[in-house]
Amino acid sequence: MFNKSFGTPFGGSTGGFGTTSTFGQNTGFGTTSGGAFGTSAFGSSNNTGGLFGNSQTKPGGLFGTSSFSQPATSTSTGFGFGTSTGTSNSLFGTASTGTSLFSSQNNAFAQNKPTGFGNFGTSTSSGGLFGTTNTTSNPFGSTSGSLFGPSSFTAAPTGTTIKFNPPTGTDTMVKAGVSTNISTKHQCITAMKEYESKSLEELRLEDYQANRKGPQNQVGGGTTAGLFGSSPATSSATGLFSSSTTNSAFSYGQNKTAFGTSTTGFGTNPGGLFGQQNQQTTSLFSKPFGQATTTPNTGFSFGNTSTLGQPSTNTMGLFGVTQASQPGGLFGTATNTSTGTAFGTGTGLFGQPNTGFGAVGSTLFGNNKLTTFGTSTTSAPSFGTTSGGLFGNKPTLTLGTNTNTSNFGFGTNNSGSSIFGSKPAAGTLGTGLGTGFGTALGAGQASLFGNNQPKIGGPLGTGAFGAPGFNTSTAILGFGAPQAPVALTDPNASAAQQAVLQQHLNSLTYSPFGDSPLFRNPMSDPKKKEERLKPTNPAAQKALTTPTHYKLTPRPATRVRPKALQTTGTAKSHLFDGLDDDEPSLANGAFMPKKSIKKLVLKNLNNSNLFSPVNHDSEDLASPSEYPENGERFSFLSKPVDENNQQDGEDDSLVSRFYTNPIAKPIPQTPESVGNKNNSSSNVEDTIVALNMRAALRNGLEGSSEETSFHDESLQDDREEIENNAYHIHPAGIVLTKVGYYTIPSMDDLAKITNEKGECIVSDFTIGRKGYGSIYFEGDVNLTNLNLDDIVHIRRKEVIVYVDDNQKPPVGEGLNRKAEVTLDGVWPTDKTSRCLIKSPDRLADINYEGRLEAVSRKQGAQFKEYRPETGSWVFKVSHFSKYGLQDSDEEEEEHPPKTTSKKLKTAPLPPAGQATTFQMTLNGKPAPPPQSQSPEVEQLGRVVELDSDMVDITQEPVPDSVLEESVPEDQEPVSASTHIASSLGINPHVLQIMKASLLVDEEDVDAMDQRFGHIPSKGETVQEICSPRLPISASHSSKSRSIVGGLLQSKFASGTFLSPSASVQECRTPRTSSRMNIPSTSPWSVPLPLATVFTVPSPAPEVQLKTVGIRRQPGLVPLEKSITYGKGKLLMDMALFMGRSFRVGWGPNWTLANSGEQLHGSHELENHQVADSMEYGFLPNPVAVKSLSESPFKVHLEKLGLRQRKLDEDLQLYQTPLELKLKHSTVHVDELCPLIVPNPGVSVIHDYADWVKDSPGDFLELPIVKHWSLTWTLCEALWGHLKELDGQLDEPSEYIQTLERRRAFSRWLSHTAAPQIEEEVSLTRRDSPVEAVFSYLTGSRISGACCLAQQSGDHRLALLLSQLVGSQSVRELLTMQLADWHQLQADSFIHDERLRIFALLAGKPVWQLSEQKQINVCSQLDWKRTLAIHLWYLLPPTASISRALSMYEEAFQNTPEGDKYACSPLPSYLEGCGCMVEEEKDSRRPLQDVCFHLLKLYSDRHYELNQLLEPRSITADPLDYRLSWHLWEVLRALNYTHLSEQCEGVLQASYAGQLESEGLWEWAIFVFLHIDNSGMREKAVRELLTRHCQLSETPESWAKEAFLTQKLCVPAEWIHEAKAVRAHMESNKHLEALYLFKAGHWNRCHKLVIRHLASDAIINENYDYLKGFLEDLAPPERSSLIQDWETSGLVYLDYIRVIEMLHRIQQVDCSGYELEHLHTKVTSLCNRIEQIPCYNAKDRLAQSDMAKRVANLLRVVLSLQHAPDATSNSTPDPQRVPLRLLAPHIGRLPMPEDYALEELRGLTQSYLRELTVGSQ
């Protein structure tokens, strides 16, 4: 390979790595300058140079040779091994004559002269690299000349062959204050000088590699193999690769050198590098420095006699594969036939001729087979197959061989083991590379490099690459082929092995069960007991210093995670197979309870931390999670470090709440231990005590999930961060220093708003934690002196406020108030991949939002929303403790949320008089037995504390007396409903239904059924437990405790105790009046062990109770005679306080239920309207109203009238504008859903205006109609037709149009102000005519003002008023007059009313008087008259409306030019009430009149429309969209279309809803038909039809349907479909099918008919009814769209037709053709009747009737076809039909057993008859 051409890409016509090749001469990498190792870089110039030394002239080599070669007759190859060179200087200053690296008698490492690696010390005779004695001292200090120290590696022992002898020494010991010198012994083998350079692990590794696990043979003199498996020989010479040595480099005990020669240098004869015998004295590469030989040549030419590149015979490949005789290069390749061709062609890298790199069938390593890399072969894909593929492929990658050897020579002729040794095979990784490199391995499971796989052992003592060691029975890369066990020269190896074997036998003797913790130390060796107790014993020291599994704890075992020995994916290292490792044969989890008593947890032992690919330090080093971390169970229970020193006075109240067992109480931490507790384990809880402690810590919700356990994000961690970080003191005393927490407002803002008293009261306070969630407190919150670090804890999927209930303030104070909680990152976990499910679609599929809503409801919170994008769960709470998501909620992914009850298995009662067994608590103290507790009570109390599903938000203990009432034995069991109903005189069944409808949740239906379905038997105890959300105080009572309390029970209580699956015998217990024994320490006391829970004490003797029956009270006792008289003020007794009062029950549709006096005017509900309203109420179906007059407790159902009943006139206000709108609209039917658009133009404006003008007088008196009139007349003035311009033929100019619009607008202003002006004039005409004159002026009634001034004698004022409409000069003169009066201060003598008129005439809205007063012309005027003043008097007569509007806007707004002096344009319903715009500061924009908005739109075409169409600008009712919608449609007709789509949708939907509420749903559809989006339009119309289409046919309904279909063009199919939905809701299958057919839903109609109607029709023989449906569905254009028509509907139809045909045949004589046709039909039915689907028993009955009848029809038809001759008088007999014609068809009919037997009887008779006839 290195001596031939390898292709041209790198060097033109030369080879890749050989002569004149890539790294040699004239190539791309080496031109005239030298190669890497033979160039002038080391001191001389050369002509050519190769990387590894081609022919050089006089180079100076690196180690003293001339580039490792000299000019010779032989061609030099890579590394220059084997050529002689001239004199040169070495790198280290020595001179050498003709040396090469490995073949000179004076080479670099074995020369007699001082060389670079040898002149550091003494000198000896000769030297070699790996152990020859040379003239130079070893650089590493040894007296031998080996590079690595000891000569031939014989000085250093391998493993522990030398017996342990503890070195002695002295030390000082202080005892009782006196120092004493003592003698010491180092009880460690590495303290011995023989092993001081190695660690324990290295010694163990060497022992394992030497297979020193059992008896060892005597070593040192045995026959051993060479370095790579060569046969041993004896020699005394040493050398690097060719000298003989007794124990050379790696082949202990052989007489060969490292690479096969026995002389110094490379020219002698003995064995080669890999154990081959050479034929004669050869060099390293089998060539004596330029001499050609003919000897076998291996891959590296090791041990052969060929020259480097000379022809040789029987050369071998790289790894010892014999190949044909051909010119051999370095790797056995032919050197004569190569040409510089493409990369990879010619001869391969390892000696095989190729066709080219990448060509079909060729590979990089010289494969000449026509297969590609990876083709299937006959051998397994592994090293050591019978072929030479790199990964086991048979024909490919032979790596220079063409024989049956593997890729690297591993494992010749194996059966094929895999690359990682998974399959045992003989001869794994076999012989190769000169019969080394893994030769002749024994059978067994092979590892990567061929060694047998021992079982996993200790961490030491393994060989490289997984081999057990050198010179063992297996090989590692060929190191140590089958040899006798070698332990260097230790003669005691055999004895040591015998001792090891004896130890194994002893371990089996004294540990018969293995090393399981369960049976650990059941027996002990008495001989070694004393030895083990000595402190100097290594086992004792190890037990003292090593953390072990086997601690003395109340658990089966603590789960300390050992450090993983490896990080690979394999289960264990194969070096340690067969060893007695520390992993117990019985796993730790074998005798441990699972994580939860409810769940089956299969622990995957292969995935434990020991073998996990990734080692977590927190898991490796952590102590067991269930034991207190550093003496602490839960970190948030510990106190700060400075408080832990006060152990004597420490208050254990908080700790004792969680730990009743003193063993489990937390140990006070030291400052050192606090910092090291963060990395805590999150291992699975699987011990009894851990389970109990975990259950004891439940206060509503357990620790959320393992990811959010108390260990990883503990509250104490947050406190430590607070203590470690200094913070400034907040002025309000607020503390918040935990990392990640924030507040809104921020802490700095809170400091700013703190008042002088140091109080901080903030509104809408929010505290959150980044990435976890937040809490929003609405309203004012007092944060003074709140330590938020201790109070608020937001963690993953849960939030805790006030951990300690003792420190929690009352509800409403502090942070214990209503709040909105947002928890982020709340996603479920996929049980398969353990990844979070974040896909919204998948979350919707598993109904995760519904699950969160159920969890919220279960916790007493109000669910708001769930955002799957961020995993945000938002809910509201009324007060605080702990909320969140628990494990059991997460585990409900795959199961429906149906409550399943748990069956209690209790121990049988002991016999009477038997002593009660004392129960032991965890701390070992005997607990007094409960007094006569029943097993249900005992178990129920325990399960409450243990069950993970129990939610206790209130954290209140269970009342003592909650389980103590009993049912009298002699009394028949009566349900609670019967008790209540009997006392009230109500039907118990009705009360039961009402109660279920009122109080049950949807998810509690199943639990309710279970609860009420179980009636306590006679003598059976009924116990209850209060719901955690509704703590009910249960008191003693001699009466039976009614089961109605179950309505308030939790699902757990109902599902557990009242289990329908529990037998009556199991639930039957003696009566008891004792109270449950609840530990007084806390509600979370540790329960008793599970084994003692079922220990039932003997019942106590009871006193027989007297049975008293129920006595019904005939009527209500008068209050004076009642025992409650005068006690109604006793607040502490809720039964007496307000005892005669009653609550009011609100029902739907404003229905009021009360037992007091009836309200006035609401008697109609007592009669007929109750039944009508039952569809909203408690009962499922309308029922007849039963009078309750026989009971003194009358319940009145009354409907409150919040407003007066709508009159027909009121509906006209809705219908008339809509009719006008429909008149001016166009219906487009281009699509399925019609679209209505307004007609362009202003005609609809005039119609609206005319309608309000012509309305009756009482109509116009309505405020809403008045405002409508103003609006429509204003629209008419602004956009309507101008009568003055209608007669003109030409288009008027813009000036004329503006002037006419001004006049029309002026008329509108005058008209709107007229009523107010008349009222003011009538009031002031006599007393103050000047004010009346001003009122006339505000309405532009100048003539009336002049007349009034003259009448009052004010002629000069009348003269001025007459000039008001004159030129501007009049205003200027009046202004001069006012200025003169002001200068002379004469205005103080003129009345203000007159000055106001003068200022108005002068055009001054505000005039300043001399007495520091001012006259405001616009004061006390509404906005329309103010605007009129600006238009008429303050602006020129030619000014436009827009200019007047702009001036008015400046008047009511504060502008830099001046202050405001006019009122704002408030809506008409706000005018005169004193409301100003300033009161609307909170809104985004001020509230203004719709008329003002219309004027703004007229002035600015792009004015915002949503302000104009807001209902509040029109009426005080914000939901009245009547005028708003009509205005929008008018503006659309005027081409104002810039309203946003959202606002338009709100407008249309709101108006449609308003019409729907008034009963005008058909007009609501008209409104919906204006929606532009066709999809939304169709959806809205269909939903509206579904809500309001009724099944009853009335003239009113017909009129509405005709209006929809004829005027609005709504498809009639939509109406029919809506009726079908209504019929389905009312369970009217007939009408549903009828309307489905009319709606065109053929398939649904067919399915409904077949499933619900066909069977009844067949059974009742109502064939015409069924035929009507089926014949309508039968046409091909319909039946082709129906699924299963051929096997369902058509079968019924053919059956009916056959019956009709038979009736016709029976009545009229028929022809033979008709009989044949009928026969065909009948026989076809016989085959198809069985295909009819049957859903219930009724369907099967109908099918059976059809089969029976078809059988009869078949007999009749066959009898008619085979009738006797006409000459005979006999009639056809169906019983005499030939059997051959009848039997095949009868057998196919699906008849029940009785029908089938009857038919069989008939067929048998026919058969016998035929036999009889045939025999005759």
UniProtKB/Swiss-Prot annotation:
Q: Which residues carry this modification: Phosphoserine?
A: 524, 608, 612, 618, 623, 625, 653, 673, 680-681, 839, 888, 934, 1027, 1042, 1059, 1063, 1328
User: Where are the bilayer-spanning segments?
Assistant: none
List where Low complexity composition bias occurs: 673-682
Q: How is it modified after translation?
A: Autoproteolytically cleaved to yield Nup98 and Nup96 or Nup98 only, respectively. Cleaved Nup98 is necessary for the targeting of Nup98 to the nuclear pore and the interaction with Nup96.
Output the Pfam families linked to this UniProt entry. Answer: Nucleoporin2, Nup96, Nup98_GLEBS
Tell me the residues on which Phosphothreonine occurs. Answer: T670, T1069, T1771
Q: Which portions of the chain have biased composition (kind: Basic and acidic residues)? A: 525-534
Q: Which UniProt keywords apply?
A: Acetylation, Autocatalytic cleavage, Hydrolase, Isopeptide bond, Membrane, mRNA transport, Nuclear pore complex, Nucleus, Phosphoprotein, Protease, Protein transport, Repeat, Serine protease, Translocation, Transport, Ubl conjugation
Can you name one GO molecular function term for this protein? serine-type peptidase activity
- Locate the region FG repeats 1: 1-156
- Top-level enzyme category: hydrolase
Q: Region Disordered: what ranges? A: 512-535, 663-682, 886-937
Q: List the residue(s) that the UniProt entry marks as the site Cleavage.
A: F880, S881
Region GLEBS, residue ranges: 157-213
Where do the Peptidase S59 domain residues begin and end? 738-880
Its GO CC terms are: nuclear envelope; nuclear membrane; nuclear pore; nucleoplasm; nucleus; ribonucleoprotein complex
For this protein, the record's InterPro entries field holds: Nucleoporin_S59-like (IPR037665), Nup98_auto-Pept-S59_dom (IPR007230), Nup98_auto-Pept-S59_dom_sf (IPR036903), Nup98_C (IPR021967)
The similarity annotation says: Belongs to the nucleoporin GLFG family.
Q: What name is this protein filed under?
A: Nuclear pore complex protein Nup98-Nup96
Whose protein is this, by species? Mus musculus (Mouse)
